[in-house]
Amino acid sequence: MVPQGINRQFVCVMALSLALVCMVAAQGNQRLLGEAMEKQAQELFGEPGKQALVQWARFVVDQGDAYQVDKERQTLEKVNAYFNTRLEFVSDASHWQKEDYWATPLESLTTQAGDCEDYVIAKYFSLIQAGVEQNKLRITYVKALKLNQAHMVLAYYADPSSDPLILDNINPRILPASKRRDLAPVYSFNGMGMWIERQQGRSIKVGSASRLSMWMDVLLRMEQQGLQPWLDLPDRQLTQ
């Protein structure tokens, strides 16, 4: 028989652990959601915008709570599936009446639609907030050879010299770039820089992504839509 004192001690430890988990989850929710962000989403996009923000934030916080570096592939799979199943592919001309438009994640989720850039942008910010380091992710402009058209995917590098995994809305399977012979990379970028992609996986850094006006416009609109916390790196990445 276990002494009663040990039982009480165990219960206290478990209760404290649960309280800490709940506190961390609450902090994550507060940082990526919050009353002010909900109100602004509703003012800009109505109730669908508010609900899209709430669902998105809760999903990402859940991924962050479950995040483990050695199980990063699971986070990639869940985030990739989340957007591939929630967004319908619609061209910019039909969706926004513009030849080319890069939507913010909130715009895409509110309208439940987007084109290739919109899938990638939403996955990029979601993965960073879920715990994946920014330097492992590159938004990559490619040519889709079978379709003979420009396309965009998200590349994940486990380390700088690795064969990146490709997150795509056309092919929902996450595969190494070496197995995506249907894609020819042109250039890539993230919040840390911009690269020209060469053959055999070689990349040449060419400076900052600030030269990409479409990217800078997305960042500005996210800020205007009250999504500044989604642009900030999580605390755990700032301390690395």
Label the model's feature ranges.
Residues 1-6:
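N-terminal secretory signal peptides that target proteins for export/translocation
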Residues 12-21:
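Bacterial N-terminal signal peptides
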Residues 24-240:
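A structural boundary/capping signal
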